[in-house]
Amino acid sequence: MSASTKRKRDQAEESVPAENPASTDVEKAIKPAQKQEEETSFVDLGLDPRLLQAIAQQKFAKPTLVQRKAIPLALNGQDVLAKADCGSGKTAAYVLPLLSSILKRKATDSTAFTTALILVPTRELADQVSKAIEQFASFCAKDISTAKLTDKVSSKVQRALLSNSPDIVISTPSTAWQNVNSSALSIDKLTHLILDEADLVLSYGYSEDLENLSRSVPKGVQVMMMSATLSDEVDTLKGIFRRDPTLLDLKEKEAEGEGITQFVAKCGEDEKFLLAYVIFKLKLIKGKCIIFVSDIDRCYRLKLFFEQFGIRSCILNSELPLNSRVHVVEEFNRHVYDIIIAADEKNEMLGDDEEPAETAEAQDDAKKSNEGDDAETEAKRPKKKAKKSKGGDKEYGVSRGVDFKKVSAVINFDLPTTASAYTHRIGRTARAGQTGMALSFVVPKDLYRKHMPTSTPACENDEKIMARIIRQQAKRDKEVKPYNFNMKQVDPFRYRMNDALRAVTKVAIREARTRELRQELLKSEKLKRYFEENPTELSHLRHDGELRTARQQAHLKHIPEYLMPKDGKQALTEDVGFVAMRKDKKGKGKKGRGFKVGSRKRDPLKTFKARRKTK
């Protein structure tokens, strides 16, 4: 090495700035702490050993972020308000510390009284919470008693359920207050009050019931509120219960490539059905899928439309009995059904939780546009409260809280009316660190009302709503990508779509609703009585049968080869299954009707000699 080269190297080394020892020490201290927190196990959280056994039985590897943060606070008796993503484990975050505290108390005091009241907005969520408690308490079932008040039973039955003072009561606010007011439920010694999906509890019109309950609960009760969004409703709840809880605004770190991939497709109202037909008939989406529509009629229109093409699906809406709804979700989670068509009738109750600055920006844009008055009215419109539906279960809810497992895709056949409802809909997929896809159909303003048989008022403001959704997702560093179908390949299927839509008339939809409701009521009674004694028979009860109220055309169930796109052929014919034309001809004729040996030798068409008659 030359002297000049060595001199340059020495100068370069001297010019490198020295590390700040203080900053280095801080970084070294922070990184191990973060790593240690991420490696925290359920054992480190200080839970009861029996709960740890149940956790191990369910094969939970380690606690999620919301569980790591909320459980220690809850065990210390602090009030908690936790905001975490859908599918992040919020239920376990309050159930585990609750069970642990009950077991700790019962070790020294065996007095029976209601310790905890869990308030939920919907019957479906109540059933899910009840099952979660049952699973986590599997090794201490004798020490934990639970009562679920959301089943449709008489007040006498509810009073009987509460007569033994169960440790935990799960209910909607209205039912809870009715029982407290009638003295069937005593909450004088209540120690825990939990609100799951806290923002939705208020949006469903339970404000008066919550006010009454807040005046009845003891002063020292511990309050826990869980939600996937932080909106004004949550602030209202804090005021109702006069609490200042520890706020946990949490977001799990996503691994690279994980999460939800969001797409939007602009199309006409009739083209929604065309694209849905192509997607499911050509199997462009693999795995289980939830399709959200705006009302019950749309549920049956889409189901009857799918029936024309032999596409099996089942329905979820507020008209169906609770037992049937719960069973549909359970069977869907067990991979019995692949497609659920869900009526999200209450998504309009949630006001948009966008920031005031964004609302002002929307108002400014609205003033500049030709539609200034309408858009400004939309921006200033107050949040809607629960609307009383003419029929159906007012405590029904499918887009919030319900734990659909391993859902590959969510399709917003009808776009929700708020960006908040959109967030919760797409939260049904990509749960617990999995991946998923969300596809939304948007009807442009110039295509609205162009096809009256399939038109619905819910599509009137699709473009405005999607603009808000895109802004909200951008704040979360999420992108809603355009999904452009190759309409040249899709158009050949249009005439088949038109044939199927013509068959799905209003009369057919009305008859389908009546028939489905009658069938599900019968199934619900069976689920309630017979299947309690014969649980193994439950798997034979299906909910995806054909309604057959629309005129069906057999040829629509099969796709002619000339209609198939070139790229779609291979994907469609991979799993063809048994085809008679390809059967091996060896051994043909060995089964079935027999024939006499030698008959071929006496073929009259070849020999012109008829066979002699035998006497």
UniProtKB/Swiss-Prot annotation:
A motif (Q motif) lies at residues 40-68. Residues 259-491 form the Helicase C-terminal domain. The keyword rRNA-binding does not apply. ATP binds at A84, D85, C86, G87, S88, G89, K90, T91. Residues 351-363 have a biased composition (Acidic residues). CDD domains: DEADc_DDX56, SF2_C_DEAD. It is found in: Nucleus, Nucleolus. Residues 71-248 form the Helicase ATP-binding domain. InterPro entries: DEAD/DEAH_box_helicase_dom, DEAD_box_RNA_helicase, Helicase_ATP-bd, Helicase_C-like, P-loop_NTPase, RNA_helicase_DEAD_Q_motif. Its EC number is 3.6.4.13. Coiled coil: none annotated. Gene3D superfamilies: P-loop containing nucleotide triphosphate hydrolases. Residues 25-37 have a biased composition (Basic and acidic residues). Keywords: ATP-binding, Helicase, Hydrolase, Nucleotide-binding, Nucleus, Ribosome biogenesis, RNA-binding, rRNA processing. Residues 1-37, 351-396, 583-615 are annotated as: Disordered. It catalyses: ATP + H2O = ADP + phosphate + H(+). It is an enzyme of class 3 (hydrolase). Disulfide bonds: none annotated. One of its GO terms (molecular function) is ATP hydrolysis activity. PANTHER family: ATP-DEPENDENT RNA HELICASE RHLE-RELATED, DEAD-BOX HELICASE 56. ATP-binding RNA helicase involved in the biogenesis of 60S ribosomal subunits and is required for the normal formation of 25S and 5.8S rRNAs. Belongs to the DEAD box helicase family. DDX56/DBP9 subfamily. This is ATP-dependent RNA helicase DBP9.
